[in-house]
C-alpha cells in the first residue's frame, strides 16, 4: 500500500517519503577502552597487529535488532604490526595500499541473535575498493548504560587484493586473517 501511494504521488509530481523505520538506541564508542586487532600467519608463526584509529557508529538493543546497525571506519594508516619492518610493508601498495585507500569501512544493517547466545552482524566490508560480505560474530553485555562487546570476523585477505597469493621468496603468508575486536560504548543522549 505504501509503495502504491509513493508511486502515485511520484506520477503526480508530488514527493512523499515512506515512514522511517524505528532505530535502536545509539551508542558512543569509548576509543581509549576499545581495540581492533588481527592475527595472521607467516609460515607457521602467528603475526599480531592492530589499528590504533577507528570509529564506530552503533545502534543496538537486544530487544530491537530490526532497528540495529553498525558502521565502523578504520584509518588504515594507523596499522601496527609486530616488528616495525612488517608495518611498513603492510602499509605498501601490494598489501593495504594506505596511500590510495586510507580507510576501510564495515557496515551492517542486519543483526540477528544466534542460538546459544551472542549475535551476528551480516555486513559488508570495503578494503582497497573491494566490497565483500563479512559476518561479524559478537557477544555484548550491557550494564548501567555501558555496553561491552567482544567479537571476531574471519577474512580471506586475498578477496580484497591484500598481499600475494602463495609464497614469495620462501615466505608463505596464509590468506586467512582473524579480526578481533573489543568495543566499549556508552549510551548516547
Give each language-model segment a name.
Residues 19-189:
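Low-complexity, acidic/polar, glycine-enriched regions of mature
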Amino acid at each position: 500500500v505504501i509503495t502504491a501511494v509513493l508511486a502515485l504521488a511520484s506520477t503526480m509530481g508530488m514527493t512523499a517519503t515512506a515512514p522511517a523505520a524505528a532505530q535502536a538506541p545509539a551508542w558512543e564508542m569509548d576509543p581509549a577502552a576499545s581495540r581492533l586487532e588481527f592475527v595472521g600467519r607467516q609460515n607457521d608463526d602467528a603475526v599480531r597487529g592492530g589499528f590504533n584509529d577507528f570509529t564506530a557508529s552503533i545502534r543496538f538493543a537486544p530487544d530491537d535488532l530490526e532497528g540495529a546497525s553498525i558502521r565502523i571506519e578504520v584509518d588504515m594508516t594507523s596499522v601496527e604490526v609486530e616488528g616495525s619492518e612488517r608495518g611498513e610493508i603492510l602499509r605498501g601498495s601490494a598489501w593495504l595500499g594506505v596511500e590510495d585507500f586510507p580507510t576501510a569501512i564495515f557496515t551492517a544493517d542486519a543483526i540477528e541473535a544466534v542460538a546459544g547466545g551472542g549475535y551476528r552482524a551480516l555486513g559488508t566490508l570495503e578494503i582497497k575498493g573491494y566490497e565483500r560480505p563479512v559476518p561479524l560474530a559478537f557477544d555484548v553485555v550491557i550494564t548501567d548504560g555501558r555496553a561491552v562487546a567482544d567479537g571476531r570476523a574471519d577474512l580471506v585477505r586475498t578477496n580484497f587484493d591484500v598481499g600475494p597469493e602463495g609464497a614469495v621468496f620462501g615466505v608463505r603468508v596464509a590468506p586467512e586473517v582473524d579480526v578481533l575486536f573489543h568495543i566499549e560504548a556508552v549510551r548516547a543522549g
